[in-house]
């Protein structure tokens, strides 16, 4: 079974910055941030985690089996750029970002979109972003 990108590495700095902005857009630390709804998952975080959960890491991707470690690292960096783009503050205004993510998910999943399940569905972030990044079945 192939390892997914989330099992190997993530660009946490970009995800954390975008998630902090999503919690308090434009105002920075503010008293309204004292209490957040417990199930509220920031949308940039949901996008990044879903993408990394659906995409194969280059180290276990059959297309990269004969590649050097450096080439695999370059491919991982390319996937990280997609995650950073998905995590941007205004990512929803850039359809090409979601097109790139969708294409990568299809490539990793053999051309067939996976079903994404969220049995707890707290604030609805995961189903919403699953549809947006990969147009996956929820």
Feature annotation, model-predicted:
Residues 2-41, 45-48, 58:
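N-terminal-proximal low-complexity accessory segments that begin disordered
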Residues 72-74, 78, 88-137:
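Conserved S-adenosyl-L-methionine
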Residues 49-53:
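Active-site nucleophile-adjacent alpha helix/oxyanion-hole segment immediately C-terminal to the catalytic cysteine
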Residues 39, 58-59, 132-137:
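Class I S-adenosyl-L-methionine-dependent methyltransferase module
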Residues 59-70:
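Short, glycine/acidic-rich hinge or "gate" loops at secondary-structure transitions
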Residues 35-39, 68, 115:
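Short secondary-structure transition/capping motifs
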Residues 1-2, 100:
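Short charge-dense sequence patches
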């Amino acid at each position: 079974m192939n390892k997914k990108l989330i099992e190997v590495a993530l660009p946490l700095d970009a995800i954390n910055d975008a998630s902090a902005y999503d919690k308090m857009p434009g105002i920075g630390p503010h008293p309204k941030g004292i209490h957040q709804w417990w199930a509220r998952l920031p949308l940039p975080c949901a996008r990044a985690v879903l993408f990394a959960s659906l995409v194969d890491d280059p180290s276990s991707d059959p297309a990269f089996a004969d590649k050097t470690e450096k080439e695999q690292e370059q491919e991982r960096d390319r996937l990280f750029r997609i995650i950073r783009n998905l995590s941007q503050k205004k990512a929803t205004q850039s359809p090409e970002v979601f097109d790139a993510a969708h294409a990568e998910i299809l490539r990793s999943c053999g051309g067939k979109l996976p079903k994404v399940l969220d049995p707890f569905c707290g604030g609805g972030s995961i189903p919403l972003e699953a549809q947006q990044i990969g147009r996956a079945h929820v």
